[in-house]
Amino acid sequence: MKFSLPKIATAPFCPPEVAGSVAVDPTATFFKRVLRFAGPGLLVSIGYMDPGNWATAIEAGSRFGYSLLFVVLLASLAGMVVQCLCSRLGIATGRDLAQLSRERYSTPTARLQWLLAEISIIATDLAEVLGCALAFHLLLGCSLTFGIALTAFDTLLVLALQNRGFRRLEAIMLVLVATIGVCFFVELLLIKPYWPDVALGFKPSLAAIGDAAPLYLAIGILGATVMPHNLYLHTSIVQTRMIGKDLASKRDAVKLARIDTIGSLALALLVNAAILILAAAAFHQSGHTDVVDIQDAYHLLDPLVGGALASVLFGVALLASGQSSTFTGTIAGQVIMEGYLNLRIPCWQRRLITRGLALIPAFIGVWLLGDGAIGKLLVLSQVVLSLQLPFALYPLIRMTNDRQLMGPFVNRWPTRVLAWGLFVLISGANSWLILQWAV
């Protein structure tokens, strides 16, 4: 049979083709409805544990032990609030954030938002490239340059999933996320952290961030938690569930989406906390307080734990983390392009363009700076995402506060105060981080 590339975008990556494709029986039991609605939150949670977050968590654990675990907890709670706003917007309006931005803002403003959103997609993909390339380098012993080149072939994975259905994609994501979780669970069993100290780390403490260094890392954790592309992604993929148009059905959908979001981000919280706990138990407790790179963490695990299994699991988790973002990045890119420009191209072309643009800084960085470029480029990707986040978060809050748009699903005043408070906090934290990186 002759092979040919698809001429049009195909499910499960194209928002119009998967909208309402997953049936949710309103007469089913509550537990069955929860299971049918589960999935969009899982895809969103992948952005909360991508390779861009690893370096910050590793440095925080190795330098300050368990003391910044409460920051991971608070940042995850903030993410839950923001993502619940996203799911509510998508269900209440039947449109995603990009579509609504195109409709409600002037053409120049909408085009600027589109450009910034596309830059954030490329920055996110850069972190995925670096994470996967580093995993190939650590697990296979190949050069970083060759590892970066290997990541170009993930476009074939996008092609392999054409016409497979959205639930198939969610199942694959579940396997990858479960792989990450199992790897870190086994890691913690091998390292045996002192759990009473771990529990104390979740207790909020101003003293723990009283100095400039821990405050810097705390802001880094907060600033890297909410990913701008996730806001567009979530408002779109929550519409994959087939629900009634009546008010009662939408209220039930909002409740089910909230459960899906909180449960999925709780899983991401456990993974991010596990990374910090791993670094604290393996490195800080043994006096290695200067571990700030993923490569250093990988190479130190074997001698400290006393076996090769720990480092192998670490590498496998890193690969699963980077690879899972391939799919969510493709969907988010389609949402942004279709929403802002009303333009649809084949998904494999979309993936190829984004990955090609992400490979350029990765190759140049490794060529000029060597292996040390990985950490610097990961930081760069987080800076770019921090710059873009307010431009996605602001319209989200404005729209969910708009009674004419949201109807009975409009934010109540406590939610408004909380949302604007998070906007000021996250934007201020990101601005402070950018100033620190600039100097």
Residue ranges and their predicted role:
Residues I172, W348-G356, L377-I426, N430:
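C-terminal membrane-solvent junction of multi-pass transporters and transport-like membrane proteins
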Residues W114-E118, L139-L161, T179-C183, W348-I364, ...:
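Transmembrane alpha-helical segments of multi-pass small-molecule transport proteins
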Residues P108-A110, T145-I148, S311, G315, ...:
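Loop-to-transmembrane helix boundary motifs in multi-pass membrane proteins
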Residues V44, V71-R104, Q113-I119, S324:
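Juxtamembrane transmembrane-helix boundary signature
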Residues E17-V22, T56-G61, C84-T109, L134, ...:
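Flexible loop linkers connecting adjacent transmembrane helices
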Residues L150-T151, L161-I191, L389, N411-R416, ...:
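Membrane-interface loop-to-helix entry segments
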Residues T155, V177-L206, L215-S236, L396-Q404, ...:
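Hydrophobic alpha-helical segments and their helix-loop junctions in multi-pass secondary transporters
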Residues M80-A92, V238-A248, A266-D296:
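Extracellular/periplasmic helix-exit of transmembrane alpha-helices
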